[in-house]
Amino acid sequence: MKDPRDIIKRPIITENTMNLVGQRKYTFEVDVKANKTEVKDAVEKIFGVKVEKVNIMNYKGKFKRVGRYSGYTNRRRKAIVTLTPDSKEIELFEV
């Protein structure tokens, strides 16, 4: 089993994700090979909360060119984690 801190890379804090915090939904960038159960277990272990469900989105790398060299940026994976109503909040996202 992977270390939970290898699965969850960083929180995504934008205006849109801060609006979702009121609905008990928290957004993280996760490892591209992590599945929903791994993300759920990692969030529960790191933050000590109860997770109700996990939604995951994949983003492909964008094409970039610098002079005559071209390539793609790294692909990413984003997870929106919904907490149960009786769970405590994650302090990282407090305003």
Curated annotation (Swiss-Prot):
Gene Ontology BP term (one): translation
Gene3D superfamilies reported in the protein's UniProt record: 3.30.70.330
Molecular function via GO: rRNA binding; structural constituent of ribosome
Pfam families given in the database record: Ribosomal_L23 (PF00276)
Keyword RNA-binding appears in the UniProt entry: yes
Keyword rRNA-binding tagged: yes
An annotated GO cellular component: ribonucleoprotein complex
Keywords (A to Z) from UniProt: Ribonucleoprotein, Ribosomal protein, RNA-binding, rRNA-binding
Quaternary data: Part of the 50S ribosomal subunit. Contacts protein L29, and trigger factor when it is bound to the ribosome.
Reported function: One of the early assembly proteins it binds 23S rRNA. One of the proteins that surrounds the polypeptide exit tunnel on the outside of the ribosome. Forms the main docking site for trigger factor binding to the ribosome.
PANTHER family, per the entry: 60S RIBOSOMAL PROTEIN L23A
Family under the similarity heading: Belongs to the universal ribosomal protein uL23 family.
Listed name of the protein: Large ribosomal subunit protein uL23
